[in-house]
Amino acid sequence: MAVVIRLLGLPFIAGPVDIRHFFKGLTIPDGGVHIIGGKVGEAFIIFATDEDARRAISRSGGFIKDSSVELFLSSKVEMQKTIEMKRTARVGRGRPGSGASGVGNVYHFSDALKEEESYSGYGSSVNRDAGFHTNGTGLDLRPRKTRPLKAENPYLFLRGLPYLVNEDDVRVFFSGLCVDGVILLKHHDGRNNGDAIVKFASCVDASGGLKCHRSFMGSRFIEVMQGSEQQWIEFGGTATEGGDTPRMRSEEHSPSRRINGRHFRKRSHSKSPRARSRSPLGFYVHLKNLSLNTNKRDLRNLFRDTDLTNDQIKFVYKDERRTRYAFVMFKNQKDYNTALGLHKTVLQYRPVLIDPVSRKEMVRIIECYEKKRPESLEKERPGRVSQKYSQEGFSGSGQKLCIYIRNLPFDVTKGEVQKFFADFSLVEDDIYLLCDDKGVGLGEALVRFKSEEQAMKAERLNRQRFLGIEVLLRLISEEQMQEFGVKSSWLSNERTQACSRSHDGDDCSCLFDLKDPSSCSFGQSESLRYHPKDLRKMGHFKHPQGYFRQSDRRSPEDFRHSPEDYRHPWEEHTSHSREEDWRLPLEDWKWSQEDDFRQCHEKDRRQLRSPWEEDFRRPSQEHFRRSYQEHIRQPPEEHFRRSREEDFRHVADEDFRQASDEDFRTSQEDLRYPTDEDFRRVSVEDLREVPEKDLRLPKNFRSPGEEFWTPPDFRGQHPFGNFDHLQGGKFDFEKYKFGSFPDAKVTSDLNLNCVSDKIIPVKISNLPFKANASEILDFFHGYKVIPDSVSLQYNEQGLPIGEAIVAMTNYNEALAAVKDLSGRPVGPRKVKLSLL
């Protein structure tokens, strides 16, 4: 049900748009605003529902155009009587020389009022949303002494149009008449204000248009009055070609004149002087906050309702780089007002600020930004690219083709960075991973793109989460990239390939200058001569292809000393095979570490002697270009024909005291892949709990006649401990077999006191209830976690209890994860890690 509200205190300059804005959020039907004006600033507003009216009354005391307004509950009868009284007062005063025409207008208005009441939902008696004129007085701004029956010129002025009207609606309103052009007037914000000026083909057509005065367009009656050519030109139209328009023109020439005039209006500038422009600033606008990717085509699409070409658009440059400013020149005030109405329109995710500007101010701004010449700019830049490099393929010094990435994991690889920029065609030569003088990753990288456009698109990935961490991106130039010690791939391609071959496929994962020791970790053979203590600190520097840890390899200088000099005091227990931890007493072991290499045949010794014995004093660079697998060639197959059970039976027959040479031959499994676990030094933690009195047979050791090895399905006793508490979880250890994990290694020894090579479960407590397996894997990034081993724990009702269990590949990784990650947050909670 419609409810009428009476408003008092409306300012003189306020209109229906201001009233609707004041009641923003409430439903006011089309034609529901009726401005009476007068000394008290009276108006009536119709609301669609009682709830809207109640909320509107609560806004009493608000401000419209800095004027306080009061709201009262009214009715349709009161509104209608007030409008009738206002009309009667206007007719009673009369206009000079109006005569009976004024009475006719009153009767015409009454008939229109009755006709509208017959189908109107709320009996409005005035033109909807037009009311009387928007000045609030109800008086015409251009009063005329008498209403002419014939038009003086082909221009008519319309008032009271609906706000959503277009040119076609106006032509339909004047159906049967030749309309030459229509200009809809707008507010400063680009919205229609309900006025328009129409140009007809002749004065005869204009006289016919005057007869449409107070005719209805939809639910509104339109006021039609005589206009002028000056108004037409002032509002963006073009002057008539060939001087003044004749008063009378034959109707048979009207269609051709209409067509020519319409085309002429679109293709020509106004011949009127600039002094006639309503805007003192001219037809120039200043665009701010533009995206750097915006081009002239985008601006033409933004101002699609205007007549705009590329020559009218000017982008502002500073130091040969695009800024976020631009200037646009319009040909008429109509397009100018339309452009100003698009203020703060979003273009390419940025709100564009459109401000009016004068020609003088525009020229001053352009000269201020572009006063420096390119020659002077090149002299000012200390890091400019030389002409030689430019001829070899360098882009312009002003282009920013590189991205500087920070906050990456320290062991990130090029392949992972490529996945982050999956939408861009990058190769590994375009990615540079930064590392310190010891080769440890800094968690930073440089990426070069083929074009500046791709680099700017890639910069949009700033603050995106990558490998569980929010990375930071910054666009830099190639000169800034070279300050990091990085040279472009096409300038040092040969040097880069030599560096890549020297450490088995880009081992250092970065392409720095080889002459800079702080930039290259493994570029020359000298970088391999680190002390073993330094090499152990680089355990997390991963090989990009085989995940082979360079830091775990021993330097050739380790073999220059005798075994007695090389061994540390704590290594006395580890100089023999791990099998002898439970076979022989420590004092019965007679062979040194060097004798292990003498058990092989002479043919095998020649294969192993070249890199380890003969050339260890002066290792050439060729030995480091080949992979370590090439140095250790696979021995003949007859060395592996004997099973391990036969070896143990042979030792048992001799009472564990006279072991033959065959027992300590290097096994096939140890020579299969030289992984990091094969050359790993036994840590103090592994030997901390190995006393001499504990060198006894393990519980699960079987006699020589029995089957020694654990069945492949692991359905018997669990070799890793008791996992009965995992029955409520998802992780099933039965499906995980030795060798099924690429990072896990099953050793060939039986030293069960050292569990560093066993799968160790880690329990995570105080997890968020909504945590999933992916978040847990991101939390353990950088640690050797079996991907499919994440087991979220649930209660009997199937709800998560905030706990999970993951499996680590060895004891050292599990212990390091517990020490480093315990107390770290996962979401809003700090989790607690413990070994099981």
Swiss-Prot record:
Compositional bias ranges of the Basic and acidic residues kind: 244-255, 550-572
Modification type N6-acetyllysine: residues: K758
Pfam families to which the protein is assigned, alphabetical: RRM_1
PROSITE patterns membership: RRM (PS50102)
Keyword RNA-binding among record annotations: yes
Region listing for Disordered, in residue ranges: 237-277, 539-572, 620-644
Domain RRM: 154-229, 283-359, 401-478, 760-836
Gene source species: Mus musculus (Mouse)
Keyword Cell inner membrane tagged: no
Modified-residue entries (Phosphoserine), positions: S703
Source superkingdom: Eukaryota
InterPro entries: ESRP (IPR050666), Nucleotide-bd_a/b_plait_sf (IPR012677), RBD_domain_sf (IPR035979), RBM12B_RRM2 (IPR034588), RRM4_RBM12B (IPR047188), RRM_dom (IPR000504)
MF annotations from Gene Ontology: RNA binding
Protein name: RNA-binding protein 12B-A
Gene3D superfamilies: 3.30.70.330
Biased composition (Basic residues): 259-277
Keywords carried by this UniProt record: Acetylation, Phosphoprotein, Repeat, RNA-binding
